[in-house]
Amino acid sequence: MTDHMIALVTGGNKGIGREIAAQLAQLGHTVIIGARSLERGEQTAAELRAAGGSVTAVALDVTDPASVAAAAERVGAEYGHLDALINNAGISHQPGADFAGQLPRTADVDHVRYVFETNVFGVITVTSAFLPLLRRSDSPRIVNVSSSAGSLAAISDFSNTDPIALGYVPSKTALTAVTMMYARDLFSDHILVNAVCPGFVATDLNGHRGLSTPAEGARSAVAMATIPADGPTGTFTDVDGPVAW
């Protein structure tokens, strides 16, 4: 594990993202919380600093290229490089819509597109913007917070009782594939790119119905963010090991 690193966590002001930030800070790393609301991001950063962490916040809306570019510029100006990018920001459905309303037979394509904007295109936008800073690191790594809900092995199993959600589930399938594309493309650059599944965690994303705590859900991302320079790349794991593609 790297002794000290600069890490950015998108969606880091609450839920799993907050816990990822907290756990990385507890390990002695400098953490930048990316949040759509700078006020909320700074509030979380202040709380984590009060607990002894080196934590700051930056305004970052993953669906807004201008916001992402401004965040990358600020991080570059203040730190000069980035060691770990944790693409944690994600949504399950469009505000005001029902997650259960994503059945393919009745799904609204605009709803599906809205989910993909954050869960897939947002990750690509952020990763592309921060790649120059990651290239300046001695041990760069990218961690994408995906979900076993998008596992092709799981969703092709007709005995699977998980919700059929045309927006969320395929967005996580796509995110895992995006992870592999980056892992292969950046392999020769020695940038480690991996996907993790936090598990079914009680957060705003699922109405706090999850069975695990955010602290437990953060463990897989923190573990992958702190792997050594010769660690794995192109993997999809949870705290128990590999997740079926």
Predicted regions and their residues:
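Structural signature of the Rossmann-like NAD(P)-dependent dehydrogenase/reductase core
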Residues: 9-10, 87-88, 141-147, 192-197
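C-terminal helical subdomain
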Residues: 173, 188, 195-196, 203, ...
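Catalytic loop of short-chain dehydrogenase/reductase
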Residues: 91-92, 100-116, 124, 135-188
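Canonical Rossmann dinucleotide-binding motif of NAD(H)/NADP(H)-dependent dehydrogenases/reductases
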Residues: 2-32
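Conserved glycine-rich Rossmann-like NAD(P)H-binding loop of the short-chain dehydrogenase/reductase
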Residues: 27-43
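The beta1-alpha1 cofactor-binding region of Rossmann-like NAD(H)/NADP(H)-dependent oxidoreductases
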Residues: 38, 59-73
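A glycine-rich helix->loop->beta "capping" turn
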Residues: 51-54, 74-87, 93-94, 108
